[in-house]
Amino acid sequence: MKFYLAPMEGITTPVYRNALYRHYGGADRYYTPFLANLSFNHKELREILPENNKGLSVIPQILTNRAETFLTIAKNLQAYGYKEANLNLGCPSATVTAKKRGAGFLSVPEQLDAFLEEIFTVCPLEISIKTRLGIASAHEWPTLLAIYKQYPLKELIVHPRYQKDFYNGRPHMEAFQMAADALSDSGIPLCYNGDIASPAQYQRLLVQNPSTEAVMI
């Protein structure tokens, strides 16, 4: 099992990541809070500078719905030695989704598909995706899965809630199993994210979905 540290704005800073690594053994991967600017400000530079992340496998996360923005940020990350970037399609915040970014981008699957086609054609980095199931309806998820399966994703990280769920209610575990079944012959690794805050919750996940190979907490 692989364990990933989820990106949390203002919490999973370089100081936090290094403290976790030094005192508790760390995680297999650490994801940064999202980057959204064409050029990095002081705070963003602090997140990604290699000297602030020595010994850590850090994956920068990008938030945008514009291919040219994603590609510019990816090229800037490449200059700092990064090999992979993660696309944020999971943030449920209204200030983000109102601009069709984060989970809000899931509301326009045709535009999302065109965006992915463009970035996968020319991006210098490998690309993973962190996603929700859609906005509010169960019919959205099969459509999104079919889109994701077309592309050579480094990994698909699924938080099995809808954008409208925010962080309320229980995750839709049947949707996560649907992803596992859909991707079983694709070669795309699958990671679970959501409501793993205790050993008991982790064990319950393994009972319900024994094929799970990675967990983001």
Please give the residue ranges for each predicted region.
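Flavin-dependent oxidoreductase catalytic cores
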Residues: M1-I217
